[in-house]
From Swiss-Prot:
UniProt entry keywords in alphabetical sequence: Glycoprotein, Signal
GO CC aspect terms: extracellular space
Annotated organism of origin: Dictyostelium discoideum (Social amoeba)
Ranges where the record places region Disordered: 680-699
Cystine connections: none
Gene this protein is translated from: cmfA
Name of the protein in its database record: Conditioned medium factor
Family matches, as Gene3D superfamilies: alpha/beta hydrolase
A Gene Ontology biological process term: regulation of gene expression
């Protein structure tokens, strides 16, 4: 007797912030390639900077706390030192000059800035810049010294703490424990950049050995990911230096640190020995975010070179795994309900945490040949098969119109099935092989159905599944209860001047660190009070959350799509992540900023998330970017951010990582920066453009 399936189509999923109905997403077979798991090498981080932790010691001769060290300068154009601390920056004094300068220990005068007392060397006077470094509402003061046309070679840097800090118990304890009291970000804008990445996204699980790769390369030879001339799986050619070493400084979720060597021996996933590509392994045993700094040192033309990248690597457990068995049954509308049987390795019960599932679906044509039908995807959770307490399945639904549209029938097959963690979009289990779909019950040939509208018309129900009745009943029934919602970003307060927008309301989830899914859930819950629907004007990560919401869950945004106007408009959103997220994880934790790290904002996290967003949902987004003004000797929104981001940028996200492929790009405004406290006004305070967004919104 055939095993019968309980119809486990997930109608609603209970979340912490209310009950949401996930969409049963589907799309054309021509879109299959858009959902491939990204190659980490394609989103590798590249920079010409390095980050140092400064641990002071007590000088018996001077009766002071100080740090002295040598910093290599390899740029002939510019050299910048930027400092961060949990203590007031005015409590430190900095001296810096080339070792070749005969007057390196002498000083002419003291320049008093907002933060530092800077000793100006007789040799050369730096440009002093004060700023606010960070992401959205999570920031810390920064102080930068920039030398134009510096002497190439080793520089002596001496940092001295003030007498008041010597009496500070917290400072004294950090000195005793050798905990860095200060961070120094060094930028050498030159052709020599570090390039680093994890080798795979498929093993980011506890108990695994995660491989990390790094090299130096020439920026002038770099082909950007956005370039049409970039070959598939391209990576730059390594620069070979002398006296080379590489290491990883790993911050574990429990706060401890490890230093791990990297090797160019061909035995650490680093391809060939002595080819300039270094590899190393991280053994992960804890759940959570790992703060990783990759440090590369060497000598080029007799001068020292040091570069580092900061990564944030989320580690989860492999709590669900595909077994390879797939079953299906038709529902009352002849739609194909597909069930992917799963188990939970090393667990006695199957984990029912909501996940993201994706699969390609194939059928059979009149000649008995396999034919691609469509892809299916959505948020779901493992549910038991009827009559079993141990066999669980994830579900997806394929609208019967997709099958009829390509003239297919049973038997059916699935391929490239992916199950991903909903918080990180780390692949939990995936298979590239083809699996037969076992049909439960008799299959009704949908080609015999008379379809209206005609099959060439792709309906919203085909793409999203059936809208919940309580939403569907409100379509076209206006009661005057619709709103434009203004949303902030990561760890932020209100950023939009509400007086610039008509019929608007401010979303207030202030000073919180949310992943995209949690952020989207809270937005949906807030918007549910507007029974006619709502639209969104979003800043920074608010744009990611808005796109996540309209993609995966039914909400008032779906009611608004029936009306004229824009449903989602965003400003300064890091759709492809920001390299600042990894660096901020290192700096933010060191200086004690309240909001913790957010892996959804990293370039890796964004790449994993973005591959799950279909083209029709991207097309709903109208986005705008900004950048610093140009024409000055030094152009920046935040000078410290320039050391981490591509140029140009808005101080948080660069113009290389703001594009949303398939979205509607509107404009890039100069002389507007991401956040308050930067070199130019905050991008959300552009009143003229705010009023334009208001007039173009649905509500």
């Amino acid at each position: 007797m055939r095993l019968l399936l309980l119809l486990i189509l997930i109608i609603t999923i209970n979340f912490s912030y209310g009950v949401l109905t996930p969409k049963n997403l589907a799309g054309e077979a021509s879109e299959f390639g858009s959902f491939n798991i990204p190659n980490p090498m394609d989103v590798a981080q590249s920079s010409d900077s390095s980050l140092f932790g400064i641990s002071m010691t007590q000088s018996q001769l001077k009766n002071s706390f100080e740090w002295s060290g040598v910093v290599p300068v390899d740029s002939e154009e510019e050299f910048t030192l930027t400092f961060f601390s949990s203590f007031p920056l005015s409590e430190f004094k900095v001296e810096a000059s080339p070792k070749t300068s005969l007057s390196s220990s002498k000083s002419e005068s003291e320049h008093k800035s907002k933060f530092y007392k800077v000793i100006k060397s007789i040799y050369q006077t730096p440009t002093v810049t004060n700023g606010s470094f960070g992401i959205d509402g999570a920031t810390t003061p920064s102080f930068s010294l920039t030398w134009d046309k510096p002497v190439v070679g080793d520089w002596n840097v001496v940092i001295t703490a003030s007498s008041s800090l010597r009496k500070n118990e917290k400072f004294q304890k950090m000195v005793e424990d050798s905990t860095p009291q200060l961070l120094m970000l060094v930028q050498n804008p030159s052709d020599t950049h570090i390039y680093s990445y994890v080798s795979s996204y498929n093993n980011l699980f506890t108990g695994q050995k995660v491989s990390v790769l790094a090299m130096l390369h020439k920026k002038s030879e770099f082909i950007k990911k956005s370039s049409a001339n970039r070959p598939l799986n391209w990576k730059p050619s390594p620069i070979l230096l002398s006296d080379v070493s590489a290491e990883m400084i790993l911050g574990l979720p429990d706060g401890s640190k490890e230093t791990i060597p990297m090797f160019d021996d061909g035995l650490h996933d680093d391809e060939q020995a002595n080819d300039g590509l270094f590899g190393g392994y991280i053994n992960v045993s804890e759940l959570g975010n790992y703060d990783l700094q990759v440090v590369y040192k060497g000598s080029q033309n007799g001068n020292g070179v040091i570069r580092s990248n900061q990564h944030l690597i989320p580690i989860t457990s492999q709590y669900l795994e595909l077994t390879g068995e797939v079953q299906s049954v038709q529902d009352g509308d002849a739609n194909l309900n597909i069930y992917f049987i799963v188990n939970s390795p090393n667990q006695t019960t199957v984990d029912q945490t909501p996940v993201h599932v994706y699969s390609e679906v194939y059928g059979t044509d009149d000649d008995g040949k396999k034919v691609a039908i469509a892809w299916v995807a959505g948020v779901t959770s493992a549910q038991p098969i009827q009559g079993s307490t141990t066999t669980f399945a994830l579900s997806a639904v394929l609208n019967e119109r997709w099958i009829a549209k390509v003239g297919a029938t049973a038997p059916f097959f699935v391929k490239n099935v992916q199950v991903s963690d909903l918080d990180t979009f780390i692949p939990l289990s995936n298979t590239t092989s083809t699996s037969n779909v076992k049909m439960v019950g008799e299959y009704k040939d949908v080609r015999t159905i008379v379809h209206s509208p005609p099959l060439h018309e792709i309906t919203k129900e085909m793409r999203d599944g059936k809208m919940p009745k309580e939403l569907a009943d409100r379509i076209g029934k206006s009661t005057g209860n619709g709103k434009l919602i203004l949303t902030h970003g990561y760890c932020s307060e209100g950023v939009w001047p509400i007086e610039d927008f008509e019929n608007s309301v401010e979303f207030q989830d202030f000073n919180q660190n949310r992943g995209n899914d949690e952020f989207a859930q809270i937005l949906a819950n807030f918007g549910s009070q507007y029974t006619d629907g709502f639209s969104l004007v979003a800043h920074s990560q608010g744009g990611n959350a808005a796109l996540h919401l309209v993609t995966f869950y039914f909400s008032g945004l779906d009611l608004s799509q029936k009306l004229e106007g824009r449903v989602i408009q965003s400003m300064g959103t890091p759709y492809q992540g920001t390299a600042l997220a990894g660096t901020w994880a290192s700096i933010g934790s060191a200086v004690g900023v309240g909001c913790s790290a957010n892996d959804d904002l990293t370039v890796d996290g964004a790449a994993l998330w973005l591959k799950s967003i279909p083209a029709d949902k991207r097309a709903l987004v109208y986005y705008t970017t900004t950048q610093y003004s140009t024409g000055s000797l030094i152009n920046y929104c935040n000078l410290a951010s320039n050391a981490v981001l591509e140029w140009p940028n808005d101080g948080v996200v660069d113009n290389e990582h703001t594009p949303l492929e398939g979205g509607v790009y509107l404009n890039n405004f100069k002389d507007w920066c991401h956040s308050d406290g930067m070199h130019s006004p905050q991008q959300t305070t552009n009143t003229e453009y705010n009023k334009e967004m208001s007039s173009n919104s649905v509500w």
